[in-house]
Structure formats: structure tokens, C-alpha cells
Amino acid sequence: MASTAAFLSTLAGSTSLGGATPASGGGSGRSKTARFLRRRRRGGAVRAAVSGTEQAPETTKKKGGGGGGGDERVVQVHSAEELDGALRAAKERLVVVEFAASHSVNSSRIYPCMVELSRTCGDVDFLLVMGDESDATRELCRREGITAVPHFTFYKGAEKVHEEEGIGPDQLAGDVLYYGDHHSAVVQLHSRADVESLISDHRGEGGKLVVLDVGLKRCGPCVKVYPTVVKLSRTMADTTVFARMNGDENDSCMEFLRDMDVVEVPTFLFIRDGDIVGRYVGSGRGELIGEILRYNGVKVT
């Protein structure tokens, strides 16, 4: 089975690296960022702005609906009790729930992508709720606030971390990569101590450029750019180390963001020999690649 990161970064990357060019300032090509926190006195409340954008219990597998053979890893649930049980059983694994309807053409169109992801991403659980199946599923949709289908909700530790509706295969794959990536070369950082340890490993002669991707759990632009980060972590492995941190994961991460004066996400910090030598704020693929090349000493025109 191919790794989650390798498959998803290929599927989600709608723009090839070879064709990426730096965006010019202003205009429609400008990258997006999520306004995230304002500078204020230490101890003040931080308001995060969401940018526009063990096995599960035995249950009935989805039948029909465009699935056919090979969709046995997409598990259909029929009630709130079944969904809650599946979320508890998953523990810290990512769970992706599609809320669909039998009459929805768009639900049928996106389902093959869901099946393909379930085959490849062995560390992610995929569940399906047919909202018009019964009174129990209609009540579950009301509880979860589902007003349109297909609607995708992402859970970790039984906590809702992200949701989308009306999306296509590329965005679904990108979302699964962002919230479920544990296998790529991107180093996952969970505290200030993790950051300091990584920086220490790359001090002195032979040390690599460290690119730290700082984001939030719920951030559209952060999700958008992450497949590019995964690709770069492989193609630039000889010269550059890529890492990421979600500022809202815990108090240590949030304190680190404040100390680094991060006020918008995604922010990329470029660290060389223990010093922050620059930063890029935004989600533009071409702009990000150009900045990384520049801090690696490559002349960019």
C-alpha cells in the first residue's frame, strides 16, 4: 500500500511544481491568508478566524450508490449512536464522514474519490451517512447541522476539526492530507521544545535550511498550500528540512506563535543556523517556492 502522503500529494496537487511561477504583486494572483490573531497584551484572549474555507464498530458496508466493489473500507453508519461509537473507537486517527443523499448527483460523483482514498489511506477511517435513509439518519444530520450534501466532516479524538461541503476530489484529497498526514517527510512539531530540537539539529556546517510552516487546524489557505509543502519536502530533501506546527494545538504552540510575531497564517519561517533569516506569509505556490530557492542561495529572476 502506497503511503498516504505520496498518494494524496499527487492527487491534491493541481499545479505541478515545474509549472509554478512567482505571482506578481496584487491582482487576482495574490495568495490568501487567514487573519488569525492581533498583537495584544500577553494573557489576552486569542481569536482564531476560520478561513473561508482500533477498528470502527462493525456496521453495514455501503451498498450501491456508485460504490460497487472495492468500497469495503467506506463504512456506512445508520444512527447517531453508531457514529459516536465509531469516533470513540478511532481514538486519535482521522475520521472522514461523508453526509450524502440517495437523490444527490454530486454525492454520487464524489463517492469514487472517497473510495479511492479509503483504499490508499490505511490510517484514516472513512464513514458514510445517507441522510435520507431513515428518521435516525435525518435526526443525525440535524444534530450535525447538515443543510446540504455532499458534506464532509473531519474528526480527531472525537472532536470535529474541519468540515466542507460542495467540494471536488482535489480539495477532498488535500483536506485528508492536511489533517491526516503522518508519513511524509514534513516534521510534525507539537511544542516549542520540538522546534528548538529541530533547529539545534541543523546548526553549523552541513546544517540545512529549515522551513517551518505555521498554521491553524481550521484554515483554508493552510490546507490549500500543504500539498505543495509535502512535494517540496521530497524534492528538496538534500538541502531543506520542512516542518509544520498548528498554533491552536496547545498552549505551547500558541505561545511560540506570539513570540515569533505570527499574526496571519499560513506563515513560513526560514531558519538558517539557528537564526530566523526571513518569512513568507501566504499560500501562493510559486511565491513560496521562489522564497525557498532564494534562501537556499539560488538566484530567482
From Swiss-Prot:
Entry keyword annotation includes Electron transport:
yes
What's an example of a GO molecular-function annotation for this chain? oxidoreductase activity, acting on a sulfur group of donors, disulfide as acceptor
- Annotated region described as Disordered, given as residue ranges: 17-73
Q: Is Hydrolase among the key words of this record? A: no
Localization annotation? Plastid, Chloroplast
- Provide the Thioredoxin domain boundaries: 50-285
Q: CDD domains under this entry?
A: TRX_CDSP32
One GO cellular-component annotation of the UniProt record comes to: chloroplast
Q: Where is the transit peptide?
A: 1-47
Give the InterPro entries listed for this entry.
CDSP32, Thioredoxin-like_sf, Thioredoxin_domain
**Keywords, in A-Z order:** Chloroplast, Disulfide bond, Electron transport, Plastid, Redox-active center, Transit peptide, Transport
- Major place of localization? plastid
What is this protein's function per UniProt?
Thiol-disulfide oxidoreductase that may participate in various redox reactions. May act as electron donor to the BAS1 peroxiredoxin. Possesses low insulin disulfide bonds reducing activity.
The protein's name is: Thioredoxin-like protein CDSP32, chloroplastic
In the record, what lineage is assigned to the organism producing the protein? Answer: Eukaryota, Viridiplantae, Streptophyta, Embryophyta, Tracheophyta
